[in-house]
Amino acid sequence: MSSTQGNGEHWKSLESVGISRKELAMAEALQMEYDALSRLRHDKEENRAKQNADPSLISWDEPGVDFYSKPAGRRTDLKLLRGLSGSDPTLNYNSLSPQEGPPNHSTSQGPQPGSDPWPKGSLSGDYLYIFDGSDGGVSSSPGPGDIEGSCKKLSPPPLPPRASIWDTPPLPPRKGSPSSSKISQPSDINTFSLVEQLPGKLLEHRILEEEEVLGGGGQGRLLGSVDYDGINDAITRLNLKSTYDAEMLRDATRGWKEGRGPLDFSKDTSGKPVARSKTMPPQVPPRTYASRYGNRKNATPGKNRRISAAPVGSRPHTVANGHELFEVSEERDEEVAAFCHMLDILRSGSDIQDYFLTGYVWSAVTPSPEHLGDEVNLKVTVLCDRLQEALTFTCNCSSTVDLLIYQTLCYTHDDLRNVDVGDFVLKPCGLEEFLQNKHALGSHEYIQYCRKFDIDIRLQLMEQKVVRSDLARTVNDDQSPSTLNYLVHLQERPVKQTISRQALSLLFDTYHNEVDAFLLADGDFPLKADRVVQSVKAICNALAAVETPEITSALNQLPPCPSRMQPKIQKDPSVLAVRENREKVVEALTAAILDLVELYCNTFNADFQTAVPGSRKHDLVQEACHFARSLAFTVYATHRIPIIWATSYEDFYLSCSLSHGGKELCSPLQTRRAHFSKYLFHLIVWDQQICFPVQVNRLPRETLLCATLYALPIPPPGSSSEANKQRRVPEALGWVTTPLFNFRQVLTCGRKLLGLWPATQENPSARWSAPNFHQPDSVILQIDFPTSAFDIKFTSPPGDKFSPRYEFGSLREEDQRKLKDIMQKESLYWLTDADKKRLWEKRYYCHSEVSSLPLVLASAPSWEWACLPDIYVLLKQWTHMNHQDALGLLHATFPDQEVRRMAVQWIGSLSDAELLDYLPQLVQALKYECYLDSPLVRFLLKRAVSDLRVTHYFFWLLKDGLKDSQFSIRYQYLLAALLCCCGKGLREEFNRQCWLVNALAKLAQQVREAAPSARQGILRTGLEEVKQFFALNGSCRLPLSPSLLVKGIVPRDCSYFNSNAVPLKLSFQNVDPLGENIRVIFKCGDDLRQDMLTLQMIRIMSKIWVQEGLDMRMVIFRCFSTGRGRGMVEMIPNAETLRKIQVEHGVTGSFKDRPLADWLQKHNPGEDEYEKAVENFIYSCAGCCVATYVLGICDRHNDNIMLKTTGHMFHIDFGRFLGHAQMFGNIKRDRAPFVFTSDMAYVINGGDKPSSRFHDFVDLCCQAYNLIRKHTHLFLNLLGLMLSCGIPELSDLEDLKYVYDALRPQDTEANATTYFTRLIESSLGSVATKLNFFIHNLAQMKFTGSDDRLTLSFASRTHTLKSSGRISDVFLCRHEKIFHPNKGYIYVVKVMRENTHEATYIQRTFEEFQELHNKLRLLFPSSHLPSFPSRFVIGRSRGEAVAERRREELNGYIWHLIHAPPEVAECDLVYTFFHPLPRDEKAMGTSPAPKSSDGTWARPVGKVGGEVKLSISYKNNKLFIMVMHIRGLQLLQDGNDPDPYVKIYLLPDPQKTTKRKTKVARKTCNPTYNEMLVYDGIPKGDLQQRELQLSVLSEQGFWENVLLGEVNIRLRELDLAQEKTGWFALGSRSHGTL
């Protein structure tokens, strides 16, 4: 009775992990014996002695990355770590696993006195920093299970593998295989490693209970009811328990509390086949990353060789136990091993002169002529601890930084003889970066930023020895061994997929026991065979549910059994009565299983390999160029088929194709159509050979094999089968690509398993993609490539010794013209077959056209071995390409290794600042590399080692790439390689950044999902957890930039936006006390990768303009995606959205012209300040128009366009681009080419009439547009490299075609100027844009608070009774006529206040009186307000009589207003209205002089007619005359503006055949045309005799047109060899000159 009770307690303790009593009893009864513990102890002692004598490559103690020190009792703080990695941060790799150190039964192994179950010392600091942990595991409050012994409830003690229960002698030691006495049990992280958390007595007690169960007579009872399905499930659960991350553990914990297991397994199915839906997929455990016998350098020669599973020779019944069948493998993937070797060389080859300087973030440098000019002076303020007051210097932009340091040291040191300038650095205040001493001041981006926005340049002088160097690499970092595989393991993964060595050993022990029983049986062979089949099925299921033909054939030799389909050929049962016959069957079956294990280990890169002697290694090599056989292989079957396919599809077939750079090498081949088959599992078996009509020696080295699985859908029941068969279309179910030549350039041979990607994902035949083992239930394709006695290797041919080069000008003019037309396409995507043929034929003439190399190489007819010498010599002799053009050679179209190596060589000249501009594209280009190691990878790693800014952004871009399932494996290795190259301090910094991002993401998600009324409280609570993060870590750099170092959060300045995504508005405390708080927006729910890409393109555009001497004054803010659906955005200070500016004039403010001008006037009251703001507005508005049009940015409303008080306009929120406009039914929401409205034109013109400033604006737009057009190839290259990034709106060539069409590279500059001018006119005249703004105003009214109505649009501040003084009397003195910004009247009001005898005078327009009254009506009932004068006037509303009448009415209104009830008369609106503005402070004695609305040109006194701007050129017997602008035309006699147009004749012209004219501009004295008028067929000699007559007329409808001015231009006086542009004076009759 007591025994039974104890047994029940034992099972109860183990049920916590979801393993039933029956399952665990069966597993233990068959696999475990107590005497294995003594053997394990003996093995461990020998293994420990071996490790002490020969340390492993990867040291768990040597890296010693300090963890965050935790004071005792701070478990709640440490619990915050849970979630970064998705696993328990208390896992101590330095502790012994149960397998390494078995418990001592005589001594308790409980915690030592004073020990804390949480780690106090240093763990591996690398443990956390790659994980997202967005599951919400970050918590600061202890839960009910967060007590000291809670960890002991998570799992039972581990179950070590036991020897066979049969009395069979062990195998003698074999050659090449360690003996059983020397086999050590490795520390596999996949198994339970909780000895440090489990008291020794409890472990001892449970093992003793196990002993009782096994030895108490229950063994036979248990054996009689063996359930192999249950065993498989139990082993799977054991494996999952040791490999799943913290999220699964939390889910399991919830399940235990609900009375169910952590995994929802089905009920007992004894005797039934293992169903696919009931078994978990194979899991990928953390590998055993170092050989226990030594590192890579001193390992024995045969230790890490691939070992083939050879058939077992004799005595299969004496096969070794499961744990002896497999040995630890350090690195089975040869490509990864070679990559690790390259990484070691790269780390050792980095020559660092001063390790201290590697911890600096250097300010980016982008030199340009403007910033280096001597004529540009800077006012710089330098602060220093040695000085009580700051120093102010005035120096040139071209002055170097060390010169400024020297000048400062003159004030801080009396004697400079012992002072080295190089020991000092200058740090911008508020940023954790440093200016580069040897570079000019003006070349630093920080200085350029300050100049652009008129910010004071404030620098701090610091000694290098006091600068924090926590990110610097050290000598120890370079000397420590590479931990690539360890870092790969730490990265976040889905469900682990590879079975562990212990679990597989346990399954093999079961198999061996059943085989022994089958061999020793005297009868009842079908039942014994069924148990063998069940054990084989369990092994195959654990090995990715793969059933090879050898296994199927071997099983067919067994008698029929219910576990599988009956074999086609029934065997005579009497044959198996002979023991030798049974041994032959078992021998074949064992060999087939070991072959499957070897295949599985090679495919999934497991941490072990079969310990069977023999290894296939080819010493003979045959060059592929001499191998003339056709490419052939056998498609056997697909494994792991979803059961739902059996009821949804039929007639499965596989389509195979060969491609190189996206181009198919031959027609695809298809297998026959097959149906489902059922052996051990469901399969689709073809077993068919595919033979391509392509010889191996004609295959390019980077040839990809693409296999696509198709099937026909089963017609629905009740439908006509014949009719449906005719209409059925095959559906693609999955695809996979694999290179035919591996990284050693050897042709693929042998059996391969390839995981299929779902057909819903992109099928990129143009690039390499790893097989899909990322998804645990992916369908697996088995292909058998032929094997041979030698390796077939692709050897790179040498280039030809000679390649002709010819001058482009030596071609015929017709050929030159055709080639130029082709080259103007700027991109290889739109080359036709005829274009390619012509380019390749004339390739030797194209050397002078450097940028055409990608087009020429894309036209190569073949990339086979025989064609490479000609291509390589062309590449070698090509003129050095600039880095912008070389980017085009990194596209998927060019997989050739030599081409990509040359491209990287040319890109190598990039500066660090330029590299950052193109880094996202280079990270995407890594997808197009065929192999893990490549010149591009080495280039990026080398640059990351030398610059922290590059390292920072490279890390976050690679981390984002982990989300790309097709390339996650590659990005895992690259990210691990980057972290290997980093120092310990930088790895810890990345760890903190990820931790902070996860905490913010959790908070943002909680605020977003909460009810609006509860959001503020949730935000405040969540910010406390962020404060705990900073209390624990001190400081952290923001992912936006490594220069932004913060030390805390400012809760009072944090809030959220009332939009759909509810982003957080956060304010961080700057570490630098001289800097301001850093304000950012954190978004959760929006994919910011598109915003990142758009801002990158705008930043590159801005740099192009600046380099060309045209600073468009663009506002570029930082934006970075820190994961899918979340990221950070920099907040621009002193900026407001157009919506908030416009609604200050009411909800219909979008239809008014003055809101923007009034807002800028309010914030820039001085005349000079306002003029500067308008100038900034003109430039930035022009830049925004060009950028948004070229990139096709849509969804433009007045809430994602912002304006700074300095006049700089910029766009935000780029959720739609490349023309993907939001639709209302079939109507596009964005109807105009870009946003350019009348209120923007009002600011530019200085009123509602066009002025010459508008000419400047149009010229700026056209000039900026043409400069971007010159770099069309750059933007096509950059966007083309991003086609595979996963952004939905940039996924195919149609999206790229939008940019191509917008840039119009085939147009001349003149045509492009005309084209963009028409776009400006179209946008300005669009009513849809204003209507869209108005609709958005209405939609946002629910988010507008009442405080938004308490300010006046023309007042920059709010004034009160207390601040201004009580008003005693007001009187409207007079009205005055004004001409700027519009013609009208202004009213002068005298304001008297108590306790003062001086009156103040204010000037207000009628519209401003009306705004005051409208906003008062929103606050008070109409009964408390005086009546306001009517705005409706019959006749002219701006006449003198109307103004006089309104003066009297307004005088009465304001008198009654100040005598209204106190709540009205004393409100802030009234006192703000009567408070003087800066414009009121001017002298009020005289009327202001009329001012022209044209701020840049005034008509000279006595001169009539104005001026016209023309551009005249002559080419190819054609005269081109571009009419650009006219300024200063006279008004008509009735005082109205004219409707001018231009008419020209080419005299002499008696027949009036040369008449040309422009369109009519309506109601303007300063029209813009930008129209090209062309005269064709005019010989150059005839041109000297001609005279151009130009007339400007005003169209008068039915009346005669009025002449406004004309000019005659003698063409012989112009040198038309070059284009002539200038202004010509208009008169009644005049001859014009420039």
From Swiss-Prot:
One of its GO terms (cellular component) is intracellular membrane-bounded organelle. Residues 635-786 form the C2 PI3K-type domain. Residues 87-112 have a biased composition (Polar residues). Its EC number is 2.7.1.137, 2.7.1.154. Gene3D superfamilies: C2 domain, Phosphatidylinositol 3-/4-kinase, catalytic domain, Phosphatidylinositol 3-kinase Catalytic Subunit, Chain A, domain 1, Phosphatidylinositol 3-kinase Catalytic Subunit, Chain A, domain 4, Phosphatidylinositol 3-kinase, accessory domain (PIK), Phox-like domain. Residues 259-270 have a biased composition (Basic and acidic residues). It catalyses: a 1,2-diacyl-sn-glycero-3-phospho-(1D-myo-inositol 4-phosphate) + ATP = a 1,2-diacyl-sn-glycero-3-phospho-(1D-myo-inositol-3,4-bisphosphate) + ADP + H(+); a 1,2-diacyl-sn-glycero-3-phospho-(1D-myo-inositol) + ATP = a 1,2-diacyl-sn-glycero-3-phospho-(1D-myo-inositol-3-phosphate) + ADP + H(+). Residues 1504-1624 form the C2 domain. Residues 176-187 have a biased composition (Low complexity). Residues 375-463 form the PI3K-RBD domain. It is found in: Microsome; Cell membrane; Cytoplasm, Cytosol; Nucleus. Residues 1192-1200 are annotated as: Catalytic loop. GO terms for biological process: autophagosome organization; cell migration; cellular response to starvation; phosphatidylinositol 3-kinase/protein kinase B signal transduction; phosphatidylinositol-3-phosphate biosynthetic process; phosphatidylinositol-mediated signaling. It comes from the Eukaryota. Activated by GRB2. Expressed in columnar and transitional epithelia, mononuclear cells, and ganglion cells (at protein level). Widely expressed, with highest levels in thymus and placenta and lowest in peripheral blood, skeletal muscle and kidney. Its main location: other. Residues 2-298 are annotated as: Interaction with GRB2. Residues 1050-1328 form the PI3K/PI4K catalytic domain. PANTHER family: PHOSPHATIDYLINOSITOL 4-PHOSPHATE 3-KINASE C2 DOMAIN-CONTAINING SUBUNIT BETA, PHOSPHATIDYLINOSITOL KINASE. Phosphorylates PtdIns and PtdIns4P with a preference for PtdIns. Does not phosphorylate PtdIns(4,5)P2. May be involved in EGF and PDGF signaling cascades. Belongs to the PI3/PI4-kinase family. This is Phosphatidylinositol 4-phosphate 3-kinase C2 domain-containing subunit beta. The gene is PIK3C2B.
